[in-house]
Amino acid sequence: MIDTLFSEVNINTSKEETTQISTEQFFINFINKLEGFKTKCKNLHWSAPKKNIHVYLDDFLSVISDYQDSIAEDYQGILGHMNPNVIEGVKSQSLNAIDFINEVKIATETFYNNIPSDTCYVGIKSETETFIHNIFKYKYLFEICDIRSY
């Protein structure tokens, strides 16, 4: 087990199972998910059947990138610098924009609900609230577009 000076965060992965990870790893895991979401967003953008969803996916990619950058920088201001090899995207299995945005929503809500309550994390919580707002905005925009189901 990795020793840490910081408290550990409980992540509920299911009703029966709880996994203990360090606060640092909690944030790194989510930043890795965001990295994977950026890759999936670009793949869906390139395979878009129509221009409308193509454009919205490109716009949403910028939203994800800006959010990830903000969270990563805030994390380092609180918990210290991360090593240059810790970010590795977690692969998304979504094959269309609707499934993708729902996957992003679920992961982000889970992250938000487990952010530590210490005052130093209020900026991350606030940024995540704005990101959740953007997720619902783009969910609506994706729903009114032509998408391809695989």
Protein language model annotation of sequence segments:
Residues I31, K38, H45, L61, ...:
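Heptad-repeat amphipathic alpha-helical coiled-coil interaction surface used
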Residues M1-F26, G123-S126, S149-Y150:
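Charge-dense, intrinsically disordered terminal/linker segments
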Residues E16-I31, F37, A97-F100, V104:
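Disorder-to-helix initiation segments
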Residues G36-D59, H81, N114-V122:
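Helix-loop segments that flank and shape redox-cofactor active sites
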Residues I87-F142:
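Acidic/histidine-rich alpha-helical segments that form the ligand environment
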Residues N52-N83:
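Conserved alpha-helical segments that form or flank metal/cofactor-binding pockets of metalloenzymes
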